[in-house]
Amino acid sequence: AEFDADGKQNILDRSEMPLPLGKNVFTSGIVNQETQNQLIQVLKRYREQLQGWGISPEETYCFASSAFRDAKNRDAIMDRIFVQTGFKVHIVDGIEENKLMYLAVTDCIKDQPIDFKNENTVILVVGGSTTEIMMMSKGKMAGVHSLRLGTVRIEEQIKNQTSSYSDIQRFVQESINNTKGSLESELNIAEVKQFIAVGQDVSLASLIVGRPISTFLWEINKQDFSDFIRDIQEYSVDECVARFKMSYSEAETFQVSLLIYN
């Protein structure tokens, strides 16, 4: 991205490569050798892309979040990344991650008809390891919670059980109910008028059943969203790949991710 004199952001280029870092860490506590090799290859491709813009690894900031934070061998991997690619990786802690997400959301909606100052709002971000919840009471932060409820964690806990739609839905609901008391002590959930969901999976859902408000902001009717989630639970991973043009690793957690948002 580049920024003009007024501080306005202009996206120049964008790249994304799926990698099962989270699945490694949440199952074994480490990033295994095969995934490390894949990570190095991805970063080398990014390095080549950046070189096309005249940007060196020394001028580039690399950030890692929950999967790296939890990996027992993170220091060794960071050293390997630096030696083989030139990128220096910075690990973002949970508090900073929430702050950056809040800033990103407020920047996205600043010129849109969303009333932060007079309405109660919940911002939800579903990841592989955790689900981050930010609660806003009339423009002020009322509470921040990190639930141990992520797509990869759920997949691992239910993979040896029957994984029907109702089973997964029940598991997610029970996990959320365990923390509902602490959430209610900070903000009356019944009074929340605005629900802002952030993430690739919910963005895809918005393209299918939502309506655009701006370039990066979409609105989804709650019932349409629930109906869509129920429909896709019948799809296999291969069907999700074919229907939604996503990678296999993305398709593996797509259905569970949307269940958490719902």
Where are these regions (language model features)?
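Helical "lid/coupling" subdomains associated with nucleotide-phosphate turnover
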Residues: 3-5, 20, 24-57, 67-120, ...
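N-terminal glycine-rich anion-binding loops that anchor highly charged ligand groups
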Residues: 9-19
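Active-site-adjacent helix-turn-beta-strand microarchitecture at beta-sheet edges
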Residues: 127-130
